[in-house]
Amino acid sequence: MRNQTFIIVGAGQAGAMAAATLRQQQFDGDIILIGKEYHAPYERPILSKDYLINPEEAPKYLFSEDFYLEKQIDLRIGQLVSQIMPSKHCVVLENGGKLRYDKLLLTMGARARRFPLLDQLGENIYTLRTLDDAQRLRQAVKKDKRILIVGGGVIGLELAATSCELGANVTVIEQADNIMGRCAPPLLQDYLLNRHQEKGVQFFLDTNIVSAQKQGSELVLILNTGEKVIGDIIIYGIGAEFRDQLAADAGLVTDGGIVIDSRCQTSEPDIFAAGDVCLQREPLTGDLQRRETWENANRQATIAAHAMMGLAPPQPGAPWFWTDQWGINIQMVGNMQAEEWHIQGDLQSDKAILFGTENEVLVGAVAINQGREMRNLRKLLANPAQVVSGVEWA
């Protein structure tokens, strides 16, 4: 493969890990890694936590500058690909330049879904997806500020905890009647809601914003309940818009994301995709699934790199992710939509394991401040046929 060129569009977690994996697997052709941001690839999980809390915290880059030089990875930051031409095996840069590829990997990720009702307020409206976003938030979140967080997902709750730790007064507004509804079982939702409320976070659940106004320096939201909430800053996280337009324009199959198979291959044989931008077909159900997690970006990057080289990909494990809120580490593995959940340990002491089962089969688990147990749980859930009939949970 010495004379081949592999191009990776998107220099985030998946893109950088794919480039590293290609070199690890002895790919000796050219690798070009193109990123829109003016930063080398960096870790995103810390942006809603340590990076905001500690003003001295530096960005955590995935690899050093020397790494890209030593591995002969051509990292091009601050560049944008404007077109893919599959029939000619080339990409067109925004400046008009063209680059030919033998294999192409798309890892463009996602952007924050916009909320025009809030955006029209102008200043002091924030989202969090990038390092630049985090740098702006770091300057805004201060002691005694009134912060309105719109969206009760993982990022919203992490920001709520972080903002409170910085001394701010925090209110969370969520359209659903629960928090973390897309990714957490009801037991965990209730547990986290209680912990946040104990720390002083105010919640408006099952609530919509019907009006948003700026009155002097204050931001005023009118809710469908008729209540009014006032803040100095609004941070919203209401989902993501996936950067699949480039692929759609090139004729690739998309469906609110780039559709890939188990090898991360798109509808074009020499084009692959990985990370948040993808929808992958589940082998058992045939359903298209998206997992917007750090672990999934790494896993798909590894699979895609192997597939691009014609190598057998590693076996995927059960999906896993984590969140840290109020000093509590919560790790989740497997299916969070299980029919039944069982508690082992004591939630009140912030140390427990939740086991999710369907038809007496273990399909998911949540470890609360039980990180040492997660390795075994991940191994256990890699085998979907573990029968748990007769297990004593308490």
UniProtKB/Swiss-Prot annotation:
Give one GO term, molecular function aspect.
Answer: oxidoreductase activity, acting on NAD(P)H
Residues where FAD binds? 5-36
Q: What are the record keywords, sorted?
A: Aromatic hydrocarbons catabolism, FAD, Flavoprotein, NAD, Oxidoreductase
**Sequence similarity:** Belongs to the bacterial ring-hydroxylating dioxygenase ferredoxin reductase family.
Any GO BP:
3-phenylpropionate catabolic process
Protein's UniProt name: 3-phenylpropionate/cinnamic acid dioxygenase ferredoxin--NAD(+) reductase component
Known EC number: 1.18.1.3
**What does the record give as cofactor?**
FAD
Which reaction(s) does its UniProt entry say it catalyses? 2 reduced [2Fe-2S]-[ferredoxin] + NAD(+) + H(+) = 2 oxidized [2Fe-2S]-[ferredoxin] + NADH
Q: Name one Pfam family in it.
A: Reductase_C
Which NCBIfam families does this entry report, sorted A to Z? 3PPDioc_HcaD, PRK09754.1
Q: Function, please?
A: Part of the multicomponent 3-phenylpropionate dioxygenase, that converts 3-phenylpropionic acid (PP) and cinnamic acid (CI) into 3-phenylpropionate-dihydrodiol (PP-dihydrodiol) and cinnamic acid-dihydrodiol (CI-dihydrodiol), respectively.
Q: Which GO terms describe its cellular component?
A: cytoplasm
Metabolic or biological pathway, per its Swiss-Prot or TrEMBL entry = Aromatic compound metabolism; 3-phenylpropanoate degradation
